Amino acid sequence: MKYIIVILIIIMNLTILSAEEYRIVDSRTGKTLSLQQMANELKKYDLIFFGEDHDNATLHKLERELVPLLDTKRELILSLEMFERDVQSDLDAYIENWLTEDEFLAKSRPWSNYQDDYRPLIEYAKQKKITVIAANIPRSIAGKMARTGPDFTETLLEEDKKWLPDNISYPDDSYKKAFLETLEDMHSPMMNNNPDWLYQAQCLKDETMAESIVNA
């Protein structure tokens, strides 16, 4: 049996106290847990979602400390939103020492905070030969959808269509409402685009990452 950690919502509440400390609370019981206690609880699950503020150093520190505690008897797979499907072969090659780090970074389009926040996870995976999933849709494809709407596939190159998920749905529900409200609160320049297209592009990302995890 394997289990997958997805670096994205965690089932516990994390109260950030400062840049150096945090408190972990089981939202079901209100009980404060140690990191080891949380890891022991999480080991019961096949799929663990870790939601993060991508720029929060404390949460990244927590990720780095948590992953080794989960890497025990069961096969562990790590899935990252940052890496996109078209760089999976490059990610695999780096984990297997077929690419240098410079070659890998040149090919894989990592986020600007990769070195400080994500590199330790990838290096741990490389050391332990843990599978890492490049789960997301290539950003160029999601961007095209955000700019032109759901008919964007008509202008996609055939070589790009292979990165699409088999199914894409756009639920008209509370998720959509919350997504659009968040964009409005952020006063994001993206709102200059059609808000529905932005939502659909997010759904495309969600569907792609979900399918990547299921197929792992």
Predicted segments, located by residue:
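N-terminal, post-signal-peptide region of Sec/Tat-exported proteins
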Residues: 40-76
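N- or domain-start disorder-to-order transition segments that initiate the globular core
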Residues: 17-45
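A substrate-binding/cap region within the structured catalytic cores of diverse enzymes
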Residues: 77, 89-214
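Sec-dependent N-terminal signal peptides
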Residues: 3-13
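Short, basic, glycine/proline-bearing loop/turn elements
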Residues: 18-24, 46-53, 102-109
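Short, flexible loop segments at the rims of nucleotide/cofactor-binding pockets, characterized by
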Residues: 24-30, 54-57, 109-112, 199-204
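Stable alpha-helical elements in mature extracytoplasmic
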Residues: 34, 38, 58-66, 114-121, ...
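Short internal beta-strands
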Residues: 77-84
